[in-house]
Structure formats: structure tokens, C-alpha cells
């Protein structure tokens, strides 16, 4: 059944009239999207009468449409274009002037061509219902109706780009993608987003190996069919400030070098340095294969266990997996009847989590409480004083909220990383676990304890034990106790360099590259395949969509080649052996800790 206004994730509008069907005993066709099903109902979806009705509706839709398909970015994936092939006519009977609607300013991300709009109101319903930002609406009636932002301002939503995917015509398109390519010219690669720890499923479209756009893939358990604007538009940074060749610093100036030169210098430095004075830090965006081979390189080649995946001291008891994952699962948010947020702002830390919380509020009127006021979260919530004593009182059953948690069937507690960075985090975290266990809230079916990781690599690195269990490494780096520091995609390490020799491996000329003595150009997240573990502990594979620029290599390959230069033997013969070894390591943990690893 053809349709324009209907969408399974939005409320019923019934205003395009394209989904007309014939219902027995009804004097005229009915809109199937708005007609409730009933016993004994006889529906005919494809009769001459219905085909004529749909052709009439299509003629009305095309009457005021500019028919500018050759210059429209929606061309090739346009619902109106496709359906007009079935129900359109080759000659218009409309001889009058077509209406012209002024384009609206919706900000730097959404390009508007409102003359093409067919008033399906999908964008309006999405902004109001899913995004929770009712800044889009319709004014006027009939031919004078217009979709507008009322005050001619940017749409203030971190989900705004989804209206581009929802728009069935070319009225709303992507500004950065204007006139870049046609859909049939693009190579499409299904992969995983790394802009946060949610692990949204995405499709990366490339033209001549250049990433042109990022679109969502439907995964009801994770991101449904939405993605954040950060996910959608971060790809424009893949062309800027890229590292495309190795560099060596001479007299405070970087000079280009060959891979052989930098490998020899690194080998010489490492061989002449006590292995206890060497450490490595893994970055936030590294895939699990790259992190694992880096750990193996430090373990086996350099013989040091000075490695860490955190850039700021954060309490994490990684001995048990439930201590650092989102145990209730992302789709479990919709089942919760009470949500408590501690030290987190999900709207900006994990946009898709915030969208799920809003969905839970709309569908179940879930009560939401936050320690501290964190601003507008697109749903109403109760704000409590978030000092340490308040948290302590809640977990020791000395607060009204304690009783609400105990009385709720499925409470859900979200702990942010800012909470885990306070001095008393260990005590409060363990108090929370004891409180939940004492009141029998943790079971095999439901675990309300959820840690909201911010970065894509966090859970995977913890699964691979890339963490300093003594919790001293970050302090020792600040005290300049190491002679060689290997920054493996790590740009956020907070320390002042003195005499350390710093090796930086990464894809962009970021903060880590500025302080480095040697720069090794690596691949970005779209330029190498690898696995990522999202915040709920689900392992998913990201696939290679393009190639690294210049002489840059994939991260695992750089480490493998460096190990060969140092020991005359590679750590792994190929990527498959590396992947197999990594999963064997995880399987040993699975047997030891009885954990379940899910692989896409």
C-alpha cells in the first residue's frame, strides 16, 4: 500500500490520502493508516476504483510540486518519484501557476526547499514525539499551509538530521551533502558508529573512497532507526588535518620520514630504555583488534604491563563485567517504571539512550529522577540535590527515593562517568550494589545497575583487561616517571611533557600529535574493519568503507610491523589470526566469569 505520511515510529496523521483502500459496505475509499482493524472487515487494496483514487491523489500532490528531479538531492531515493511512476500521469491538466513557498532557515545541517513539501508532517511529528523539541509546526490552511520553525531559527535538537531521512520528498535535505553525488553512484557499507558507546548501526556511503554521508540502519535493540547529528555529520572531519605520512621531530619541527626510519628510531629507543619506564595508553576510538595487538605488543615484545585505556582516573572494578556495562540493555529502558540518573546527562553523552528514556516516559509515564539539575532532557524529571550525602542516604535506605526504588518492579539506575570520578565513587558504587542485592532487585531477568560509558572503546578495552588495576599509572605519568610514552590513538591524556619520548599513533593531527616526537599515521574508523563492544556489552563488527590517505596504515598493521622490526617476527600472520586470538582471549574470560558475548 503506497503512503507518504505514515511511519511506523510516528503517530497516525492520515493527511496524504495516498493509502486509500476499498472497504466493503463503505460508500467511499478509506485511509488505511487511520482505519482500525475489526472482525469481519473485508479490505481490497488493489481494485480499479482504488487505483483511480490513488491516481487522483497523486495528481493533486504533483499539481504544485516543482518537478525539479534533475537538480534535487532526493532524486533516486524519493518516495514521490517512485510512486508517481505507478500512479502518476505523463501530462498535467494543471495549467495555472504553481504555488511558491519561501525556504525556511533550519540551521547549518538541514537544507530546505519548501516548494517541494507535500505536507506529510513527518518532520513535525518526529520533532514533537521522538526528539522532544516541538520547534517545527504547520501554519496556514489549504494551499497556504507551510511547515516552519515559527521564529526562523535553527532546530535545537541533537536528532534533527533524522528529519532528512523521514522526508519522503526533497523538501528537507542535508546541507553538507548538497550536489555531492547520486545514490546509485555511492558504495554502501554497513558498519558501526563510534561517536558514542551506544554502537548505533549505520551505513557509510562513499564516492571514489571518500565518505559522503552516514545514514542509520534499523536495529530495534540499539538505535531503532535514528542516529544523532554527531554520528551523521562527524564524517566531514575525515578529510581535515589527516596524518598521511610518518613524522619525526627535529629541533621542534616535524619532518617527513619513511616507515623504516621511524621503526628503527623506535626500536633503538625501546632497546635502550628500562621496560619499567615504558607505558602505553589506548584511545577512545580504537577497535578491539587494534587494542588487543597493542596490549600484546607491550606484553610480549616490550615485556611491560604499563598500559591503560582511561585518560582520567575513574573507579572501575573490572573484575566483574556487570560493574561496567549497561545491564538492563538499551531496549530494557522501555520496561522500567522508575529511572534514576546519577552523574550523567544522557542527552549529550548518549543521545539514543535519551531518546529511549523519552519513549519510556511517553508510553509508560515512567518516573524519572536525576541527582542534580542537568538542564532540558526533553522529558520532565525530578531533580534532587546531588551531593555525596544525598547519594549515601539513598543507598542506605534513608531517603524517600529508597522506598520508591524498593517498591518499583523494574527500577533502572544509570551511572555516569562523572560520578565514577569522585573520590568516594568506590564506596558509593559498592553501597548501591549492596542496596540492590539486599532488596532483591538484581536477578537473572533484570539488573537495574547500568554504567553509561561515553566512548566507543571503553567496554571493549575493559573486556580485554587494558586497565591498570593498581590505579597508579595516570598519577605516575603526571609525575613524569616514564621515559617513553606510546599514545595509541590517545589525545586526552592530561599531563605536562618534560623529557619523555612520546610516540603518537593516530589518524588526525590532534593534541597527541602536537606533543609527540614521532608520529605514526593510522587509519580512521571508516578505514579499517574491527569489532566494538557497545555499552550494553554487545560485540558488533565495523566494516571498512574507505582507505587511509597517503602512506597511512591500519592500526593493527603498524603494531605488527613494529613488532617484526624489533623481534624479527610478527605478532600475527594476518588479521584473521589476530581476530581469532582476540576471541579466544574473550572465551577464556567467558569460561572464567560466565559472561555472554554477543557477536553481530
Which positions does each model-derived feature cover?
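An alpha-helix initiation/capping motif
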Residues: 10-13, 161, 288-292, 426-429, ...
Amino acid at each position: 500500500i503506497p503512503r507518504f505520511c505514515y511511519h511506523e515510529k510516528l503517530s497516525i496523521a492520515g493527511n496524504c490520502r495516498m493509502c486509500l483502500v476499498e472497504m466493503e459496505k463503505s460508500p467511499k475509499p478509506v485511509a488505511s493508516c487511520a482505519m482500525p482493524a475489526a472482525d469481519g472487515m473485508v479490505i481490497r487494496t488493489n481494485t480499479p476504483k482504488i487505483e483511480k483514487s490513488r491516481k487522483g491523489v497523486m495528481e493533486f500532490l504533483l499539481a504544485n510540486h516543482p518537478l525539479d528531479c534533475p537538480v534535487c538531492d532526493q532524486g533516486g531515493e524519493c518516495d514521490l518519484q517512485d510512486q508517481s511512476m505507478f500512479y502518476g500521469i505523463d501530462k498535467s491538466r494543471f495549467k495555472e501557476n504553481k504555488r511558491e513557498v519561501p525556504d525556511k532557515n533550519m540551521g547549518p545541517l538541514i537544507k530546505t526547499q519548501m516548494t517541494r513539501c507535500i505536507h506529510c508532517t513527518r518532520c513535525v511529528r518526529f520533532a514533537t514525539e521522538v526528539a522532544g523539541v516541538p520547534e517545527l509546526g504547520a501554519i496556514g490552511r489549504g494551499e497556504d499551509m507551510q511547515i516552519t520553525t515559527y521564529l526562523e531559527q535553527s532546530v535545537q535538537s541533537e536528532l534533527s538530521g533524522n528529519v532528512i531521512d523521514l522526508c519522503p520528498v526533497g523538501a528537507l535535505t542535508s546541507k553538507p551533502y548538497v550536489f555531492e553525488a547520486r545514490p546509485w553512484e555511492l558504495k554502501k557499507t554497513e558498519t558501526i558508529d563510534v561517536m558514542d558507546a551506544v554502537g548505533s548501526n549505520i551505513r557509510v556511503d562513499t564516492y571514489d573512497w571518500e565518505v559522503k554521508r552516514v545514514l542509520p540502519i534499523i536495529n530495534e535493540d540499539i538505535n531503532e532507526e535514528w542516529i544523532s547529528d554527531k554520528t551523521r555529520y562527524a564524517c566531514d572531519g575525515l578529510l581535515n588535518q589527516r596524518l598521511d605520512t610518518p613524522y619525526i621531530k627535529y629541533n621542534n619541527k616535524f619532518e617527513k620520514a619513511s616507515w623504516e626510519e621511524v621503526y628503527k628510531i623506535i626500536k633503538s629507543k625501546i632497546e635502550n630504555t628500562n621496560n619499567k619506564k615504558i607505558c602505553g595508553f589506548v584511545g577512545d576510538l580504537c577497535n578491539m583488534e587494534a587494542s588487543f595487538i597493542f596490549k600484546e605488543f607491550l606484553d610480549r615484545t616490550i615485556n611491560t604491563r604499563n598500559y591503560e585505556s582511561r585518560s582520567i582516573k575513574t573507579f572501575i572494578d573490572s573484575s566483574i563485567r556487570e560493574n561496567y556495562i549497561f545491564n538492563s540493555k538499551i531496549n530494557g529502558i522501555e520496561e522500567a517504571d522508575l529511572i534514576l540518573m546519577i552523574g550523567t546527562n544522557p542527552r549529550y553523552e548518549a543521545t539514543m539512550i535519551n531518546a529511549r528514556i523519552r519513549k519510556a516516559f511517553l508510553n509508560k509515564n515512567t518516573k524519572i529522577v536525576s541527582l542534580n539539575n542537568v538542564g532540558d532532557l526533553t522529558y520532565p524529571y525530578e531533580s534532587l540535590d546531588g551531593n555525596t550525602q544525598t547519594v549515601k542516604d539513598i543507598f542506605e535506605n534513608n531517603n524517600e527515593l529508597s522506598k520508591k526504588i524498593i517498591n518499583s518492579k523494574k527500577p533502572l539506575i544509570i551511572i555516569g562517568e562523572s560520578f565514577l570520578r569522585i573520590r568516594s565513587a568506590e564506596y558509593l558504587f559498592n553501597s548501591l550494589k549492596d542496596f540492590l542485592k539486599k532488596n532483591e532487585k538484581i536477578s537473572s531477568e533484570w539488573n537495574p545497575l547500568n554504567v553509561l560509558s561515553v566512548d566507543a572503546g571503553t567496554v571493549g578495552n575493559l573486556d580485554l583487561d587494558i586497565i591498570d588495576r593498581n590505579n597508579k599509572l595516570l598519577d605516575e605519568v603526571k609525575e613524569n616517571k616514564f621515559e617513553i610514552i606510546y599514545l595509541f590513538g590517545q589525545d586526552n591524556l592530561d599531563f605536562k611533557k618534560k623529557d619523555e619520548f612520546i610516540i603518537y599513533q593516530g589518524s588526525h593531527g590532534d593534541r597527541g600529535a602536537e606533543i609527540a616526537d614521532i608520529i605514526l599515521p593510522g587509519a580512521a574508523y571508516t578505514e579499517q574493519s574491527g569489532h566494538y563492544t557497545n555499552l550494553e556489552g554487545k560485540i558488533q563488527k565495523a566494516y571498512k568503507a574507505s582507505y587511509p590517505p597517503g602512506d597511512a596504515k591500519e592500526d593493527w598493521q603498524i603494531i605488527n610491523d613494529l613488532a617484526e622490526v624489533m623481534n624479527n617476527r610478527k605478532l600475527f600472520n594476518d588479521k584473521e589470526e589476530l581476530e581469532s586470538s582476540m576471541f579466544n582471549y574473550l572465551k577464556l574470560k567467558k569460561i572464567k566469569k560466565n559472561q555472554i558475548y554477543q557477536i553481530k
